Amino acid sequence: MTIILGADAHGNDLKEAIKGFLQQEGFDVTDVTAIADDFVDNTLAVARALKADEESLGIMIDAYGAGPFMVATKIKGMVAAEVSDERSAYMTRGHNNARMITMGAEIVGQELAKNIAKGFVTGHYDGGRHQIRVDMLNKMA
């Protein structure tokens, strides 16, 4: 599994901290950040990479996390969540089969962001009764 990271200028420092942490934890990390680009373009770059590799997961960081979340959820078949705590990151994998999370560098600090990233990438989709909702989400966009 590859973890695809992206950030705009506001999220780049936090992204770098998460990147180093995930690499230290043994994860394969690909950074698609184009620092001069807006969060919209960087979110689309993460989403394109996720679409190209169905086994990958993505994390996109800007100042507040809301903008990238809105962009990601406009993409057909992309289930994403804006998170600011570890439990939500873990549960969105387990119950929603989210492939991307978004975070805000103005909302979470480095240690919390690392824990959020770890919760997300170590979570596993539970399937079963949750698949009904995932199917509903995939039909919507």
UniProtKB/Swiss-Prot annotation:
Its EC number is 5.3.1.26. Pfam families: LacAB_rpiB. The lineage of its organism: Bacteria, Bacillati, Bacillota, Bacilli, Lactobacillales. Belongs to the LacAB/RpiB family. Pathway: Carbohydrate metabolism; D-galactose 6-phosphate degradation; D-tagatose 6-phosphate from D-galactose 6-phosphate: step 1/1. The keyword NAD does not apply. GO terms for biological process: D-allose catabolic process; galactose catabolic process; lactose catabolic process via tagatose-6-phosphate; pentose-phosphate shunt, non-oxidative branch. GO terms for molecular function: galactose-6-phosphate isomerase activity; ribose-5-phosphate isomerase activity. It comes from Streptococcus equi subsp. equi (strain 4047). This is Galactose-6-phosphate isomerase subunit LacA. Heteromultimeric protein consisting of LacA and LacB. PANTHER family: GALACTOSE-6-PHOSPHATE ISOMERASE SUBUNIT LACA (PTHR30345:SF5), RIBOSE-5-PHOSPHATE ISOMERASE B (PTHR30345). Signal peptide: none annotated. Keywords: Isomerase, Lactose metabolism. It catalyses: aldehydo-D-galactose 6-phosphate = keto-D-tagatose 6-phosphate. HAMAP family: LacA. It is an enzyme of class 5 (isomerase). The gene is lacA.
